[in-house]
Curated annotation (Swiss-Prot):
Monomer. Interacts with PAK6. Interacts with the phosphorylated form of IKBKB/IKKB. GO terms for molecular function: magnesium ion binding; manganese ion binding; protein serine/threonine phosphatase activity. It comes from Mus musculus. The gene is Ppm1b. This is Protein phosphatase 1B. Mn(2+) 2 binds at residues 60, 243, 286. Mn(2+) 1 binds at residues 60-61. The keyword Cell membrane does not apply.
Length: 390
């Protein structure tokens, strides 16, 4: 859904913070889309007495940003203030909600905010038909609660490996397809009624009006899946991202890339920016948002890794200069030509999971310095063929 620009918008929104024994950074980019429909939440210290809890989420809007933006501001409140979430507090003896009350309260919060937004005039009268996925993690001192509604995704890296990931809610999944068909719908070209690419979402009220069916039995359900994981010393980091990231990187590729970048920089905004840029250069045509939450055992900056990365940058700079000097007699080559030549070479120590796309910013900088009057497109469309093997 959504139209494309002639040239991607590569300006980024960034934020970072720390507390409760963790650090976070985030980055979002509009990219090739005509509108920016992503949103996010990052809260260290949850209100109403949960100061040692944190909450992070990414929302991937479609058909507009109304639902995504509202959820980014109000979903946490709907979760933490409903009676199910606070069930353990009724006796007054429990300082924190139980695991089961948290899971139930998260589900209730999603259903309540979805019901609440339905009454907004622009959503009720059909002037706004937007919807949004939501993927998040609520971190308590003892547990992580992973939350997913739609096809954004969260992954946990522990002991250097992906040890958990949420499951995308796609219409072709058997459980999702059965619900859609029971509600009188169909799955065509892997979409709900041939149109919507996700089977669970907030908003999307055009798909939630089947008489005699409850809110979780509609063509599109607002019910999240909630997973609890006991925290461990080996936990390194959590990545939350929209499908603009996952469309071009697997769980393992993204975690390998993040690990390698954490070894050369402790600036989490920079690491997230590298993720977004790399995905753009790998061919992503969607809005892109990523939130990185690092625990105390996350990879640390390594002198050896920094040296290796610096040597790689110098090698790439030298090769770009050589390619452009050699081609100069026939006219200055465009950036895509330079990238195609480099992609055919066996270049050691490229960022794992990112490949040459993970170093395009270095190549672009040299190219622009040597050819300042050439307009770099900053995009990925001209590189998809040359980078397909990376």
């Amino acid at each position: 859904m959504g139209a494309f620009l002639d040239k991607p918008k590569t300006e980024k929104h960034n934020a970072h913070g720390a507390g409760n024994g963790l650090r976070y950074g985030l980055s979002s980019m509009q990219g090739w889309r005509v509108e920016m429909e992503d949103a996010h939440t990052a809260v260290v210290g949850i209100p109403h007495g949960l100061d040692n809890w944190s909450f992070f989420a990414v929302y991937d809007g479609h058909a507009g940003s109304r639902v995504a933006n509202y959820c980014s501001t109000h979903l946490l409140e709907h979760i933490t203030t409903n009676e199910d979430f606070r069930a353990a507090d009724k006796s007054g003896s429990a300082l924190e909600p139980s695991v089961e009350s948290v899971k139930t309260g998260i589900r209730t919060g999603f259903l309540k905010i979805d019901e609440y937004m339905r009454n907004f005039s622009d959503l009720r009268n059909g002037m706004d038909r937007s919807g949004s996925t939501a993927v998040g993690v609520m971190v308590s001192p003892t547990h992580m609660y992973f939350i997913n509604c739609g096809d954004s995704r969260a992954v946990l890296c522990r002991n250097g490996q992906v040890c958990f990931s949420t499951q995308d809610h796609k219409p072709c999944n058997p459980v999702e397809k059965e619900r859609i068909q029971n509600a009188g719908g169909s799955v065509m070209i892997q979409r709900v009624n041939g149109s919507l690419a996700v089977s669970r979402a907030l908003g999307d009220y055009d798909y939630k009006c089947v008489d005699g069916k409850g809110p979780t039995e509609q063509l599109v359900s607002p019910e999240p899946e909630v997973y609890e994981i006991v925290r461990a010393e080996e936990d390194e980091f959590v990545v939350l991202a929209c499908d603009g990231i996952w469309d071009v990187m697997s769980n393992e590729e993204l975690c390998e890339f993040v690990k390698s970048r954490l070894e050369v920089s402790d600036d989490l905004e920079n690491v997230c920016n590298w993720v977004v840029d790399t995905c753009l250069h790998k061919g992503s045509r969607d809005n892109m948002s990523v939130v990185l939450v690092c625990f105390s055992n996350a990879p640390k900056v390594s002198e050896e890794a920094v040296k290796r990365d610096s040597e790689l940058d110098k090698h790439l700079e030298s090769r770009v200069e050589e390619i452009m000097q050699k081609s100069g007699e026939e006219g200055m080559p465009d950036l895509a030509h330079v990238m195609r030549i480099l992609s055919a070479e066996n270049i050691p120590n490229l960022p794992p999971g990112g490949g040459l796309a993970g170093k395009r910013h270095v190549i672009e900088a040299v190219y622009s310095r040597l050819n300042p009057h050439k307009d770099n497109d900053g995009g990925a469309g001209d590189l998809e063929d040359s980078l397909v093997a990376l």
